[in-house]
């Protein structure tokens, strides 16, 4: 069985278990367009150009996940060599971490714990139902009004969710300072003026 056949089977299995296309896209680290194709494609149809990322070896292991969270913090510090004050630790310049559900949440939680910051959770519109789905901040965690925030997720695929969360934060009087991701499939430097700090950039060579 080819890796494409396996992806098709996995996408259809997740759908049969009640996952929405948006949730399937997150589970497989694929774009919504690719997931739609996996679920509906007919034999001979051309597949969308995308890259499947499987990092479950890390994401399923608490110790490794903790190490990746530390790596994301260090990556930001390396890009911003803060002038140190004797006897004090450098500061991120932010007081809140916004984790994007689903896969951004454990990373954001670990980062917030390490940096002693507030933790907010964002549910993107693609996880909502109804005719006009909208994204929202969970009421069970920190709110974002008036906060300087760092946005955290595992993958940038199409960039739509990042645009969505940046606009949401600004509408709710928060200031997005940076976007941290493990994998960037677009190779972008910023989203609506907010700088992107990825650990890995994924490029497709056709």
Curated annotation (Swiss-Prot):
Keywords: DNA-binding, Transcription, Transcription regulation. InterPro entries: GfcR-like, PRibTrfase_dom, PRTase-like. GO terms for molecular function: DNA binding; orotate phosphoribosyltransferase activity. GO terms for biological process: pyrimidine nucleobase biosynthetic process; regulation of gene expression; UMP biosynthetic process. It holds the Pfam family Pribosyltran. Gene3D superfamilies: 3.40.50.2020. The keyword Transport does not apply. Belongs to the purine/pyrimidine phosphoribosyltransferase family. GfcR subfamily. Contains an N-terminal DNA-binding winged helix-turn-helix domain and a C-terminal regulatory domain (or effector binding domain) resembling phosphoribosyltransferase (PRT) domain. PANTHER family: OROTATE PHOSPHORIBOSYLTRANSFERASE (PTHR19278), PYRE-LIKE PROTEIN (PTHR19278:SF41). This is Transcriptional regulator GfcR. It comes from Methanosphaerula palustris (strain ATCC BAA-1556 / DSM 19958 / E1-9c). The gene is gfcR.
């Amino acid at each position: 069985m080819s890796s494409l056949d396996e992806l098709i089977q996995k996408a259809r299995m997740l759908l049969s278990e009640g996952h929405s296309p948006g949730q399937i896209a997150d589970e497989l680290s694929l774009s919504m367009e690719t997931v739609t194709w996996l679920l509906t494609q007919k034999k001979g149809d051309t597949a969308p150009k995308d890259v499947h990322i499987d990092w479950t070896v890390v994401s399923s292991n608490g110790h490794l996940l903790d190490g990746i969270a530390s790596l994301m913090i260090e990556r930001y510090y390396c890009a911003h060599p803060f002038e140190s004050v004797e006897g004090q630790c450098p500061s991120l310049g932010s007081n809140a971490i916004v984790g994007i559900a689903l896969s951004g949440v454990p990373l954001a939680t670990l980062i917030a714990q390490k940096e002693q910051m507030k933790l907010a959770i964002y549910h993107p519109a693609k996880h909502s139902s109804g005719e006009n789905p909208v994204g929202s901040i969970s009421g069970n965690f920190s709110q974002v009004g008036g906060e300087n925030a760092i946005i955290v997720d595992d993958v940038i695929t199409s960039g739509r969710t990042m645009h969505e969360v940046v606009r949401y934060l600004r509408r709710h009087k928060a200031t997005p300072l940076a976007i941290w991701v493990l994998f960037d499939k677009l190779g972008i430097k910023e989203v609506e003026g907010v700088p992107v700090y990825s650990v890995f950039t994924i490029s497709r060579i056709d």
